[in-house]
Amino acid sequence: MPRRLQPRGAGTKGPPAPAPAASGAARNSHSAASRDPPASAKPLLRWDEVPDDFVECFILSGYRRLPCTAQECLASVLKPTNETLNFWTHFIPLLLFLSKFCRLFFLSGGDVPFHHPWLLPLWCYASGVLLTFAMSCTAHVFSCLSLRLRAAFFYLDYASISYYGFGSTVAYYYYLLPGLSLLDARVMTPYLQQRLGWHVDCTRLIAAYRALVLPVAFVLAVACTVACCKSRTDWCTYPFALRTFVFVMPLSMACPIMLESWLFDLRGENPTLFVHFYRRYFWLVVAAFFNVSKIPERIQPGLFDIIGHSHQLFHIFTFLSIYDQVYYVEEGLRQFLQAPPAAPTFSGTVGYMLLLVVCLGLVIRKFLNSSEFCSKK
């Protein structure tokens, strides 16, 4: 499908200009007629009536006008636009997860108060989950305020996904990885000797891995945000494929759990983690398929403009993946509290998250101030 190369000019719509000799009354009549209709009366636009940066592949109609006011953006969530269900498919999960984390922190009735250091990794993880859904909703609702604000909101959306990914790694590091046989030198050293004949002391290797997990995940979070922001510039031919690939990279932080299931009896020892971990990755594969393939709108452009297009399906399956993740992170927390090691530190949890916020903010600022944004139509 061809794409517009320039935004629609301000004077491309409306009656022709009056002749110089027209009376004042005629000029006033034309001026009144050329005023924008009220928000409720503004029709939705087709793909060739909006700036190129607003056009979604194979989505032909249902576009909102640019610029809209904040009030018009909010009102549009109750109207049949091509962004309406993009909002609701993440706003409803946002409410569900907000309720879930409130119960975990404040209403669980456990012996651990919400401010205990043992719960710091859970706070990091919960903030990532909630921020991701909240930022996605904000980006989809207010993306038609202006071209610059549209870019800013989606940069923030990418940053929130990276923030969530790092928060997940923090939760894994404290709640899930300590329970793996793969990261226990007392288990791995004799295992390698018996299975492979390797006489290797795994103590240093495992210690090195533990020391590098969070720094590497931190660097990946910043790098992924840079790559995704870069994908909104003109050099990127397949931005959706690039963003999908980029956000798959941080999932490698969960490789120890996958290796644990291959080398040891994870299914028998921790069936909750086994089932929900693999089901989560099934949902992620399905979500990636829809995000890259642009099915079903690729098959029948125009039919799924309002309901059923790939981005809505992508939202639904990412929600399901995070739902499963929350389930096994909660189970990992329960096991952690039964025999907790040293309490997580503020600097090793919240401190990392705050530093990441600063770095991601600097990345977004750089891209908003760069000349590449100005060249994007």
Curated annotation (Swiss-Prot):
Keywords: Cell membrane, Lipid-binding, Membrane, Receptor, Steroid-binding, Transmembrane, Transmembrane helix
GO MF: signaling receptor activity; steroid binding
Region feature Disordered, mapped onto this chain: 1-40
Cell location: Cell membrane
One cellular component (GO) term of this entry: plasma membrane
Transmembrane segments: 87-107, 117-137, 163-183, 206-226, 244-264, 302-322, 344-364
Keyword Plastid annotated: no
Keyword flag Cell membrane: yes
Extracellular membrane side: 108-116, 184-205, 265-301, 365-377
Low complexity composition-biased segments: 9-26
Tissue expression: Expression levels vary widely in a range of tissues. Expressed in the brain, at high level in the pituitary gland and also in hypothalamus, limbic system, caudate nucleus accumens, pons and olfactory bulb.
Membrane protein topology class: Multi-pass membrane protein
Cytoplasmic side of membrane: 1-86, 138-162, 227-243, 323-343
Function description: Plasma membrane progesterone (P4) receptor coupled to G proteins. Seems to act through a G(s) mediated pathway. May be involved in regulating rapid P4 signaling in the nervous system. Also binds dehydroepiandrosterone (DHEA), pregnanolone, pregnenolone and allopregnanolone.
Subunit structure and binding partners: Homodimer.
Other comments on record: Non-classical progesterone receptors involved in extranuclear signaling are classified in 2 groups: the class II progestin and adipoQ receptor (PAQR) family (also called mPRs) (PAQR5, PAQR6, PAQR7, PAQR8 and PAQR9) and the b5-like heme/steroid-binding protein family (also called MAPRs) (PGRMC1, PGRMC2, NENF and CYB5D2).
Protein name: Membrane progestin receptor epsilon
